[in-house]
From Swiss-Prot:
Similarity section: Belongs to the HSP33 family.
Superkingdom of origin: Bacteria
Organism: Streptococcus mutans serotype c (strain ATCC 700610 / UA159)
Cross-referenced CDD domains: Hsp33
Protein name according to UniProt: 33 kDa chaperonin
PANTHER family found in the cross-reference section: 33 KDA CHAPERONIN
Length: 290
């Protein structure tokens, strides 16, 4: 199972999250039948969302909306504090040739737009904040969001590597954050280490990429693992939820659906599961509105 490890430098000056999200992104690709570029863009967004949700407590949920004006359209992801995440990309069919180094192109097909984060604390008043997309590569956009919106200087690396058949080979990433206790000397040292760090794709290719990520972040400095959490792609859609959505329609709309379409089919955007509602189901809803 995928996992996220939270750690902190022994000095208390920095904290880091490292993630193995391979199965999460693999499941998303299978559910949406997404092609190469779309898979990488969606995968990076899911990983970013897993990081943001891991920052929360209780039963909070975090929604990430990467709203671009290019080929991908919008990417929407929702994660909770229990390691569950789901998401979809408007255009799952973007398949652009890789660069000479084998990297899948993402940024230009995200375009200009916003990185939006909605945090629902379960109180009925979700908090929304956003920053402009700085590159469309998702990792850089998350780092900018954390630094500008949450006022926490952060370094982020996210990626999804595909095999020769464009199936998910490995996915994961890291987030490193400066804590108030950090001295200027420590900040300079960590900045240098991050600048000299191997590419995230190289680290993910390592046999034990979780350990490789931790080693790249902390070097020879001591750190403490705080907690290890399981991660998974899970959709919480249900027939009851979509039935409730249908019940928000007017009586005339339900009648029109029953008489013209002889039923209704609703497809969950997050996982592709289909829910069928027969004429008799719609009739029952109409009667309930009487």
């Amino acid at each position: 199972m995928d996992k996220l490890i939270k750690s902190i430098a022994k000095s208390g000056s920095f904290r880091a999250y490292v993630l193995d999200s391979t199965e999460t992104v693999r499941t998303a690709q299978e559910e949406h039948q997404s092609l190469s570029s779309s898979t990488v863009a969606l995968g990076r967004t899911l990983i970013a969302n897993q990081i943001l949700a891991a920052n929360q407590k209780g039963d909070s949920k975090v929604t990430v909306k990467v709203i671009g004006d290019s080929s991908f359209g919008h990417i929407i992801s929702v994660a909770d504090t229990k390691g569950n995440v789901k998401g979809y990309i408007q255009n799952a069919g973007v398949d652009v040739k890789k660069t000479a180094s084998g990297e899948v192109i993402v940024g230009p097909f995200m375009g200009n737009g916003q990185f939006v984060v909605i945090t629902d604390y379960g109180t009925g008043n979700p908090y929304t904040s956003s920053t402009p997309l700085v590159s469309g590569e998702i990792g850089e956009d998350l780092a900018y969001y954390l630094t500008e919106s949450e006022q926490t200087p952060s370094a982020v690396g996210l990626n999804v590597l595909l095999d020769e058949k464009d199936k998910v080979k490995v996915a994961g990433g890291f987030m490193l954050q400066v804590l108030p206790e950090a001295s200027e000397e420590e900040i300079t040292r960590y900045e240098k280490r991050i600048q000299e760090m191997p590419a995230i794709s190289t680290l993910l290719e390592s046999e034990d990429h979780i350990e490789a990520l931790l080693k790249a972040i902390y070097g020879e400095e001591d750190y403490k693992v705080l907690v290890e959490e399981d991660l998974q792609f899970t959709c919480d859609c249900s027939r009851q939820r979509f039935e409730a959505a249908l019940m928000t329609l007017s009586k005339s709309d339900l009648k029109e659906m029953k008489e013209e379409d002889h039923g209704a089919e609703i497809v969950c955007q997050f996982c592709g599961k289909k829910y069928q509602f027969k004429e008799s189901d719609l009739e029952e809803m109409i009667n309930d509105k009487a």
